[in-house]
Amino acid sequence: MANIKSAIKRAELNVKQNNRNSAQKSAMRSAIKAFEANPNEELFRAASSSIDKAKSKGLIHKNKASRDKARLASKLAK
């Protein structure tokens, strides 16, 4: 465990950020799975939105976001 006060604070913040990021990423995955189980326009918009939010927060790379959205759009079109 860290001894320096600022290091202790950073460690606590890292735990909070990790929890927040994990929840956001999990919500994104859940939205994608919901869409894949029942592809429709409403679930597509929700999944696409959650992917964009994860991208804007730096949780996923912009190219992965684009690839995922393209795959979802392809499934919606079928």
Swiss-Prot record:
Key words, A-Z: Ribonucleoprotein, Ribosomal protein, RNA-binding, rRNA-binding
Domain of life: Bacteria
Keyword Ribosomal protein: yes
InterPro entries: Ribosomal_bS20, Ribosomal_bS20_sf
Gene Ontology biological process terms from the UniProt entry: translation
Region (Disordered): 55-78
Pfam families: Ribosomal_S20p
GO cellular component entries: cytosol; small ribosomal subunit
Keyword Transit peptide recorded: no
GO molecular function, one term: small ribosomal subunit rRNA binding
Role summary: Binds directly to 16S ribosomal RNA.
HAMAP family: Ribosomal_bS20
Family designation: Belongs to the bacterial ribosomal protein bS20 family.
Protein name: Small ribosomal subunit protein bS20
Organism: Streptococcus mutans serotype c (strain ATCC 700610 / UA159)
